């Protein structure tokens, strides 16, 4: 609702952490968007995402959607990915299985064995900056990042192409389940240094996670 009050259309939207297309559906229904580049690191989640392509077209046939089974990060490298049975929690970050949040979450989701919560495999990671250069993008009207504790790394991987971003939306987890090597202050300082200002903040239901919107 906040975005709809202030924006009607976006030419280029980049969706990092597509999962199974929740952001694509939400934005296609509520905004005119010329093109969406949607990234999902997990090959398992990506297969589910691909199956919804026809549905996306029905929602808004005027929006071109590019789906990429690609992991993004701060460097071009290979990293271990944790594919959760509850797929929206999949992440590159280490997990504290002894944390209260982990135990509470998987008890509610009927995961009786902590060891079965996720399995691991390696994924190739590249910087978003490289993709932007490859596609010759000259503007990014809206960048959404939801990567379960890996948001800061995505931002660092933009390099100087962060100057192309007009509006940024991301989630930040304050719970102790995801072991991060940064704090919200690190992200906030980084964005301020790149001429962004926070314009919106909202707590997500039933969890210690906030959604933020910044604009330059």
Task: Pin down the residues of each PLM region.
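Phosphate/nucleotide-binding beta-alpha loop and adjacent structural elements of enzyme active sites
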Residues: 1-216
């Amino acid at each position: 609702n906040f975005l709809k009050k202030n924006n009607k259309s976006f030419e280029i939207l980049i969706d990092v952490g597509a999962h199974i297309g929740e952001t694509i559906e939400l934005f296609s229904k509520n905004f005119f968007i010329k093109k969406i580049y949607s990234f999902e690191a997990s090959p398992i989640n990506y297969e589910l995402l691909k199956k919804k392509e026809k549905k996306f077209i029905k929602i808004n046939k005027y929006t071109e959607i590019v789906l990429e089974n690609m992991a993004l990060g701060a460097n071009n490298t290979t990293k271990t990915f944790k594919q959760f049975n509850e797929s929206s929690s999949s992440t590159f970050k280490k997990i504290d299985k002894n944390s209260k949040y982990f135990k509470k979450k998987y008890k509610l989701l009927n995961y009786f064995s902590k060891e079965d919560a996720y399995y691991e495999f390696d994924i190739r990671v590249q910087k978003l900056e490289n993709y932007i250069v490859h596609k010759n993008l000259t503007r990014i009207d809206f960048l959404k990042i939801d990567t379960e504790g890996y948001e800061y790394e995505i931002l660092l991987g933009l390099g100087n192409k962060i100057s192309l971003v007009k509006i940024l939306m991301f989630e930040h987890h304050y719970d102790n389940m995801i072991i991060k090597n940064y704090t919200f202050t690190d992200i906030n300082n980084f964005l301020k240094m790149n001429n962004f200002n926070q314009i919106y903040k909202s707590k997500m239901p039933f969890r210690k996670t906030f959604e933020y919107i910044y604009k330059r």
